[in-house]
Amino acid sequence: MTARTPAQPPTTGWRRMIARAPVQLYRWHLGPLLGRRICLLTHTGRTSGLPRQTALEVTGTDPATGAIHLASGFGPASQWYRNIQNTPKVTVQSGRRHWTGTARPMTPDESGRAMAAYAPLHPRTARTLMRICGLTTDGSTQDWYRIGHDHIPFVEITPDPRTQ
């Protein structure tokens, strides 16, 4: 059964510096060292209109379309998630691949299925994400589904045909 515990406060100081390190690695053209599991998402700020960047874990892929799935660990209040809802055109860099695409928030059912598929593949990362987000789980497939459905929205980014 999913339960909510007090979430950790937003990262500041040296923790923020560590959390933002992958973005800096991409800026130094060292992003491929992170592999394909961490991507750099460039999106447009909803109020400033300026480019914003965040490094996120690729939680899944759709080989048929080339789409990637990303999880908004801090829910729909995450700045990047709110920005892509306003302007869905994004740029993604994953490994050496650089492409433009369109972001689409997945439905709660799709998010639930994505979380239930992700958690068994990366159990330690999933448990760490739950702790950071202030959620607990019994580890069952149904509980992971419920977490994705109720708390962690996922996003699908489909490459533009001309950049594949």
Residues covered by each model-derived region:
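Alpha-helical membrane-targeting segments
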Residues: T2-I38, R124-D150
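A hydrophobic membrane-anchoring alpha-helix module
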Residues: I147, I152-Q164
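Short strand-connecting beta-turns/loops that link adjacent beta-strands
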Residues: P63-T65, R97, R162
